[in-house]
Amino acid sequence: MGARELCDDDEVVPARGQVIFVEQDPGVGHFDQQPETLTYTIPRSDVTVLGGTAQVDDWGMDIRAEDNDLILSKVEALWPELDRSRIIGGAVGLRPSRSEVRLEVEYIDERKVVHNYGHGGAGVTLSWGCAEEVANLVSQSA
């Protein structure tokens, strides 16, 4: 969220993301995107992340029971084998969001600055492509 101040970008607003952690392997990831919700299972080495929310301009950092209920019901539609007894916790974070990702070069005091922010809830999805573009922009001569 620091881009609001660092880059003087008033367009940056939080997209509140809430997730649940479960010690159960779904085998593969599951994804479904609808307005205001991002339903997914992302297997990691230690847990599977169940998500999630994308509540734009919501600064709330508390885990909300109603969001957990929504996440679980949507995940169970994609992954009926989910075992709720294996839930071990959850988290909330604020993802910088804007109308479109800011991925560009700006020169500040004759120094090249590459901006790459505003992905909102699509950070995981866009990370590889954006990282490649950042590398290209950095390697281009001034």
Q: Language-model segments: which ranges?
A:
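C-terminal catalytic lobe of FAD-dependent flavoproteins
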Residues: 82-142
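Active-site substrate-recognition segment that forms the wall
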Residues: 1-109
